[in-house]
C-alpha cells in the first residue's frame, strides 16, 4: 500500500505540473487570440478559448491492466498481501471506478446542457453587445492601457505568490532540518554502545573462564574418584587371591596332618624319604609362619583398607555434595549465560538498528550536503547572472543617456534648420499656375506661326510627360522610403523576437537542467527510502516473529497457571463443603443427644408421676407407648446416624488422603510454577527489550506522524492560499464548456477543410515570388552563415574537451582531498565526543561534590541543633525541672503515629482478607454478595447433606421494571437431582 500511495503522490504531482502547463498554454493562447482578434473579425469567424483539459475516459479502461491491479497481483505473488485482502482492495477499487464512470457520465451530460445554455447566452449577449456598442465599436488606447495594467498586476500578484511559496518552503525545510538534528542528537553515541559491549564482553569472558575452571575441577574430581574405585577393585582382587591361597594352605596342612599316620604305617617304606620329609616339614613350618605373618599383615591391611574405604566414601559423599552444589551453581551460571546471550542478542539487534539509523543519517547528511552544495552553486550562478545583468543595466543606462543626448541634439538641429521645405509645395503650385498662364497666353497669341504653335504644343506635351514621370518617380521614392522603413521595423521586430526566443530557450534549458537535477535527487531519495523500508520491514518481521513466540509461550504458561489455580480452588471448595457438612452433622448429632437426654428425664418424671397419680394411668400408658415409639424411632435414627458417621469418617479419611495427594501435587505444581516464574521473568526481560525496541519504532512512527501533520498543514496552507475555489470551479466549468464547443467547432472546421467544394479552402498569400537569382543569393548567404556557425561549434567543442580534461583532473584531486577531510572530520568528531564526555563527567562530579558539601553543611547544622537540645535537656534534668512541652508533643505524635500505623496495618490485612474472600475462581475480584453454591435436599428419613449446584447455579431474579410489569412472570422449574 505504501508503493500505491507513493505512485498516487507522483501521479498527483504530474497532474499538478500538467495543470500548470495547461494554465501557461491557456495564457499563451489568450495572447494569441487577443492578437488574432482583428483577423478573426475580418474573416467573421467565431473565436473560442481552447483549454488543454486532458479528460481520461474511464469507461474504456480495462481494470485488469491498471497499475493498482498489477501492483496488487505483484504483492500477492510475493506473499506480502493475502488473497482476502487483495479481493477486498479490488472490490473497493472497482466501486471507486464505477463511481468515477458514473460521475464522468453525469459530467458529460451536464456539460452538454451547459454548452447548450451557454450558446443561447452567448447569442443573447452578442445581440445585447451589438445593441449597446453601436456608436463606439472601435477599441481605444485607454482600453489597451487598462489591459496592460491588469496584465502587469496579475504578473505582480503571481510573483508575490511565488515568493510566499518559496519562503514557506524555506521555513518548512528549516523546521525539518531542526527536527532531523533533534533526532540525530537523540540517537545514542557509538562510544557509549562500544563501552556497553566491551563491559558485556568482559563479563561474559570472566563467566566463561569461571565455568571452564569449575568444569576442570569437576573433571579432576571425577578422575580422582575413578582412580580410587579402580584401586579399591584391584586391592579387593588381591585380597580374594590371598584368601584362596590361605584356604589351599589350610587344606595342605590338613593333608599333612594325616601324613604322620601314614608314615607310621609305612615307616619301612619311607625310611629313605624321612630326611627329605623332615626337611620339607621344616620348610613348610617356616612357610606356615611366614603365611601366618602374611595373613596377619593382610588382615591389618584389610582393616586399614576398610578404614580408608570408609574415609574415601565419606570424602566421595562430601565431594558428591560439593559436586551437586557446583552443578547447581553451574546451572545458575548457565541460566546467567543464557540471559547474557539473550541480552547480547538484544544488544546486537539494537546495534543493528543503530547501525541502520547511523547509515541512514550519514546518507541523509550526504544528501543534504549535496543539496547544499547544489544550492550554493545555484546561488553563485545567480550571483554571477545578477552581476552580468547589473553590468548590462549599466551599459544600457549609459546607452540610454547617450541616445537621449543625441535625440536632444538632433531636435535642436532640426529646430535650427530653416523651414523652407514646408513652403516648397506651395511655390511649386504657384509656379505651375504661372506656367499654365504662360501657356495659355502663348496659345492665345495669334502672331505665332503654325510651326511655332506645333513646337509649343510638342514642348507642352513633353513637359506634361516629364511632370507625370516626375510625379511617378516621386511616388516611387516615397513608396521605397516607406518600404525601407517597414523592412527596417520588421527586421528590428524579428531581431527582438529572436532575442526573446534565445532568452526563452536559455531559460527553458536551465529549467530543464534544474528539473533533471531535482528528478535525480528525488530518484536517489526514493531508492534510499525503498532501501530503508526494506530494512525496517525485515527488522519488523524478525521482531514480530520473536514477539509472537514469546507471546505464545506466555499464553501457555498463563493457561497452565490458571488451570492449576482452578484445580486448587476446586479442591479447596470441596474441602470447605466437606468441612461445613461435617460441622452441620456434628451439630445435628449434639441436638439428637440433647433430645435423647431430655426424653430420658421426661421418662423419669413420668414414672414418678405414675407412682403419684393413679387416676391418669391410662393416659400415661398411652403417653408411654408414644414415648416408646419415639424412642424406637430415635434409636433407629441414632443407628442410622452412627452408620453415617462411619461413612463420614471413611469419607473424611479419603478426603485427607486426597488432600495429602493434592498437597503433594500442589508442591510439584509449585515447583513447576517456580520454574514457570523463572521463565516468565526471562520472558519479561525479553519483553522489556522488545518494549524498548517498540518504543523506538513508536518514536519513528511519531516522527512520521509529525511529517504527515506537516504535510497536512502544508495542504491546509495551500488551501488557504486558494480561497477562490468556487470561482475556479466555475471557471473550470466554463472552460470545459468552451472545450466542448471548441471540439465541436474543430469537427465543423475539419468537415469544411475536407470538403472540396468549399470556396474558402484555399487562401493565396500576398507578396511577390523570388526570382532564381535572388534565391541563389539567399542560398549562398545561408551557406556562409552555416559555415560560420560550424566553425564556431568546432571551436566550442575544442574548448569543451580541454575544459572537461581539466575538470576531470580537478575531480580526481578533490576526491583524494575528500578522503583526507573525511578522516580528519572523523578524528575531530571522536575527539569532540571524548571532550564532551569528559566535560560531562567533570560537571557531574562537581555537581555531586556540591550536593555532598550542601548535605554535610545541613548535617552539621542538625548535629549542632541536636547537641544544643541535648545540653538543654540535661541542664533541665540536673536542675530538677520537667522537659519542654514540645518534647511531650513530639512523644505524643510518635505514639499517635504508631497507633495509626497499627490501625492501618490491621485495616490493610482486613481488606486483604476481604479481597481474598471476594476473589472468584476465575481470578476476578468482586464486592457482590456470594451466591449459594450448594442446597439442602428434602428428606424425611435421614438428615440431608448439602449438595453443590455445579456450573449452572440459580440466581435471585430482580423485580421487573415498569416497562415489563405487563409481561407474565416465568414459571420456576423444579430442580432435578
From Swiss-Prot:
Q: What outcome follows a substitution of residue 245 to D?
A: Abolishes interaction with Ccdc42
Q: Where does the record say this protein resides?
A: Cytoplasm, Cytoskeleton, Microtubule organizing center, Centrosome, Centriole; Cell projection, Cilium, Flagellum; Cytoplasm, Cytoskeleton, Flagellum axoneme; Cytoplasm, Cytoskeleton, Cilium basal body
A Gene Ontology cellular-component term? centriole
Keywords of this entry: Cell projection, Cilium, Coiled coil, Cytoplasm, Cytoskeleton, Differentiation, Flagellum, Spermatogenesis
Q: Which GO terms describe its molecular function?
A: protein-containing complex binding
Q: What does UniProt note about where in the body, tissue by tissue, this protein is expressed?
A: Widely expressed. Expressed at high levels in testis (at protein level).
Gene Ontology BP terms: cell morphogenesis; cell population proliferation; cilium organization; flagellated sperm motility; gene expression; manchette assembly; nucleus organization; single fertilization
Q: Which residues form a coiled coil?
A: 204-238, 267-343, 631-658, 693-722
Q: Provide the primary localization.
A: cytoplasm
Sequence segments annotated as region (Disordered):
1-48
Q: Where is the composition biased (Acidic residues)?
A: 8-29
Question: Does the record bear Coiled coil in its keywords?
Answer: yes
Q: What happens when the gene is disrupted?
A: Knockout mice are viable and do not show any overt phenotype. Males are infertile. They exhibit normal mounting behaviors and produce coital plugs but fail to produce offspring after mating with wild-type adult females. Significantly reduced sperm count and motility with spermatozoa displaying morphological abnormalities including short, coiled or absent flagella, abnormally long manchettes and abnormal sperm heads. Abnormal organization of outer dense fibers and axonemes with mislocalization of Odf2.
Family annotation (PANTHER family):
CILIA AND FLAGELLA-ASSOCIATED PROTEIN 58-RELATED (PTHR32083), COILED-COIL DOMAIN-CONTAINING PROTEIN 146 (PTHR32083:SF34)
Q: What does this protein do?
A: Essential for sperm flagellum biogenesis and male fertility.
Query: What interactions and quaternary structure are annotated?
Result: Interacts with CCDC38 and CCDC42. Interacts with intraflagellar transport proteins ITF20 and IFT88.
Protein name (record): Coiled-coil domain-containing protein 146
Species of origin: Mus musculus (Mouse)
The gene that this protein is the product of is: Ccdc146
Amino acid at each position: 500500500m505504501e508503493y500505491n500511495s507513493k505512485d498516487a503522490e507522483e501521479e498527483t504531482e504530474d497532474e499538478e505540473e500538467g495543470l500548470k502547463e495547461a494554465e501557461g498554454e491557456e495564457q499563451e493562447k489568450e495572447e494569441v487570440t487577443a492578437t488574432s482578434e482583428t483577423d478573426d473579425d475580418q474573416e467573421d469567424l467565431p473565436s473560442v478559448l481552447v483549454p488543454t483539459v486532458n479528460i481520461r475516459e474511464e469507461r474504456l479502461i480495462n481494470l485488469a491492466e491498471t497499475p493498482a491491479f498489477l501492483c496488487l497481483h505483484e504483492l500477492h505473488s510475493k506473499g506480502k498481501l493475502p488473497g482476502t485482502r487483495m479481493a477486498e482492495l479490488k472490490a473497493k477499487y472497482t466501486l471507486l471506478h464505477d463511481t468515477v464512470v458514473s460521475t464522468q457520465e453525469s459530467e458529460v451530460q451536464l456539460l452538454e446542457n451547459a454548452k447548450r445554455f451557454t450558446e443561447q447566452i452567448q447569442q443573447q449577449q452578442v445581440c445585447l453587445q451589438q445593441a449597446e456598442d453601436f456608436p463606439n465599436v472601435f477599441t481605444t488606447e485607454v482600453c489597451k492601457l487598462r489591459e496592460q495594467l491588469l496584465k502587469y498586476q496579475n504578473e505582480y500578484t503571481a510573483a508575490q505568490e511565488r515568493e510566499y511559496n518559496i519562503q514557506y518552503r524555506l521555513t518548512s525545510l528549516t523546521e525539518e532540518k531542526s527536527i532531523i538534528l533533534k533526532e540525530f542528537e537523540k540517537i545514542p553515541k557509538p562510544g557509549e554502545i562500544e563501552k556497553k559491549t566491551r563491559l558485556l564482553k568482559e563479563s561474559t569472558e570472566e563467566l566463561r573462564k569461571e565455568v571452564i575452571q569449575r568444569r576442570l575441577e569437576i573433571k579432576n574430581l571425577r578422575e580422582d574418584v575413578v582412580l580410587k574405585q579402580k584401586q579399591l577393585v584391584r586391592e579387593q582382587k588381591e585380597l580374594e587371591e590371598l584368601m584362596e591361597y590361605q584356604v589351599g594352605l589350610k587344606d595342605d596342612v590338613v593333608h599333612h596332618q594325616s601324613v604322620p599316620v601314614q608314615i607310621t604305617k609305612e615307616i619301612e617304606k619311607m625310611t629313605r624319604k624321612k630326611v627329605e620329609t623332615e626337611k620339607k616339614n621344616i620348610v613348610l613350618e617356616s612357610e606356615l609362619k611366614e603365611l601366618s605373618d602374611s595373613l596377619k599383615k593382610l588382615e591389618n591391611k584389610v582393616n586399614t583398607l576398610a578404614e580408608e574405604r570408609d574415609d574415601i566414601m565419606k570424602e566421595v559423599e562430601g565431594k558428591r555434595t560439593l559436586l551437586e552444589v557446583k552443578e547447581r551453581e553451574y546451572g545458575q551460571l548457565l541460566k546467567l549465560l543464557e540471559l547474557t546471550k539473550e541480552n547480547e542478542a538484544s544488544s546486537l539487534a539494537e546495534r543493528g538498528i543503530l547501525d541502520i539509523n547511523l547509515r541512514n543519517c550519514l546518507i541523509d547528511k550526504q544528501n543534504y550536503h549535496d543539496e547544499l552544495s547544489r544550492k550554493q552553486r545555484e546561488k553563485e550562478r545567480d550571483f554571477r547572472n545578477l552581476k552580468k545583468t547589473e553590468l548590462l543595466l549599466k551599459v544600457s543606462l549609459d546607452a540610454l543617456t547617450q541616445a537621449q543626448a543625441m535625440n536632444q541634439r538632433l531636435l535642436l538641429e532640426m529646430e535650427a534648420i530653416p523651414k523652407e521645405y514646408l513652403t516648397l509645395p506651395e511655390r511649386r503650385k504657384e509656379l505651375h499656375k504661372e506656367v499654365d498662364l504662360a501657356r495659355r497666353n502663348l496659345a492665345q497669341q495669334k502672331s505665332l506661326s503654325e510651326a511655332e504653335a506645333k513646337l509649343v504644343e510638342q514642348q507642352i506635351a513633353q513637359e506634361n510627360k516629364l511632370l507625370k514621370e516626375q510625379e511617378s518617380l516621386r511616388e516611387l521614392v516615397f513608396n521605397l522610403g516607406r518600404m525601407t522603413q517597414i523592412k527596417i521595423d520588421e527586421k528590428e521586430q524579428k531581431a527582438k523576437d529572436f532575442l526573446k526566443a534565445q532568452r526563452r530557450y536559455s531559460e527553458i534549458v536551465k529549467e530543464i537542467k534544474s528539473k533533471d537535477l531535482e528528478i535525480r535527487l528525488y530518484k536517489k531519495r526514493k531508492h534510499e527510502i525503498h532501501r530503508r523500508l526494506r530494512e525496517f520491514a525485515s527488522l519488523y518481521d524478525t521482531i514480530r516473529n520473536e514477539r509472537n513466540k514469546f507471546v505464545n509461550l506466555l499464553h501457555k504458561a498463563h493457561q497452565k497457571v490458571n488451570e492449576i489455580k482452578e484445580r486448587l480452588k476446586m479442591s479447596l471448595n470441596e474441602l470447605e463443603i466437606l468441612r461445613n457438612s461435617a460441622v452441620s452433622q456434628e451439630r445435628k448429632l449434639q441436638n439428637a443427644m440433647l433430645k435423647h437426654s431430655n426424653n430420658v428425664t421426661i421418662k423419669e418424671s413420668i414414672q414418678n408421676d405414675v407412682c403419684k397419680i393413679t387416676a391418669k394411668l391410662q393416659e400415661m400408658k398411652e403417653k408411654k407407648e408414644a414415648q416408646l415409639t419415639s424412642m424406637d424411632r430415635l434409636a433407629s435414627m441414632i443407628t442410622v446416624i452412627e452408620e453415617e458417621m462411619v461413612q463420614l469418617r471413611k469419607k473424611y479419611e479419603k478426603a485427607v488422603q486426597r488432600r495429602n495427594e493434592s498437597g503433594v501435587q500442589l508442591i510439584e505444581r509449585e515447583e513447576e510454577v517456580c520454574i514457570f516464574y523463572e521463565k516468565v521473568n526471562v520472558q519479561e526481560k525479553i519483553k522489556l527489550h522488545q518494549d524498548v525496541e517498540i518504543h523506538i519504532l513508536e518514536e519513528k512512527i511519531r516522527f512520521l506522524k509529525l511529517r504527515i501533520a506537516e504535510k497536512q498543514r502544508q495542504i491546509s496552507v495551500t488551501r488557504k492560499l486558494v480561497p477562490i475555489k468556487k470561482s475556479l470551479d466555475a471557471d473550470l466549468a466554463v472552460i470545459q464548456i468552451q472545450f466542448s464547443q471548441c471540439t465541436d467547432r474543430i469537427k465543423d472546421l475539419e468537415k469544411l477543410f475536407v470538403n472540396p467544394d468549399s470556396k474558402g479552402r484555399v487562401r493565396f498569400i500576398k507578396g511577390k515570388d523570388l526570382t532564381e537569382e535572388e534565391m541563389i543569393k539567399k542560398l549562398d548567404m545561408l551557406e556562409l552563415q552555416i559555415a560560420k556557425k560550424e566553425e564556431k561549434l568546432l571551436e566550442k567543442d575544442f574548448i569543451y574537451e580541454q575544459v572537461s580534461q581539466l575538470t576531470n583532473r580537478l575531480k580526481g584531486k578533490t576526491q583524494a582531498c575528500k578522503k583526507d577531510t573525511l578522516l580528519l572530520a572523523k578524528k575531530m568528531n571522536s575527539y569532540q565526543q571524548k571532550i564532551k564526555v569528559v566535560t560531562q563527567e567533570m560537571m557531574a562530579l562537581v555537581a555531586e561534590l556540591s550536593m555532598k558539601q550542601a548535605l554535610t553543611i545541613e548535617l552539621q547544622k542538625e548535629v549542632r541543633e541536636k547537641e544544643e537540645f541535648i545540653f538543654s535537656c540535661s541542664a533541665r534534668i540536673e536542675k530538677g525541672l520537667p522537659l519542654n512541652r514540645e518534647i511531650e508533643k513530639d512523644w505524643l505524635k510518635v505514639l499517635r503515629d504508631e497507633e495509626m500505623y497499627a490501625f492501618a496495618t490491621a485495616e490493610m490485612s482486613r481488606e486483604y482478607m476481604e479481597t481474598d474472600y471476594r476473589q472468584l475462581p476465575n481470578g476476578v475480584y468482586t464486592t457482590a454478595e456470594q451466591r449459594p453454591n450448594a442446597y439442602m435436599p428434602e428428606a424425611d428419613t435421614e438428615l440431608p447433606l448439602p449438595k453443590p449446584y455445579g456450573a449452572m447455579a440459580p440466581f435471585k431474579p430482580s423485580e421487573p421494571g415498569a416497562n415489563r410489569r405487563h409481561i407474565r412472570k416465568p414459571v420456576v422449574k423444579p430442580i432435578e437431582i
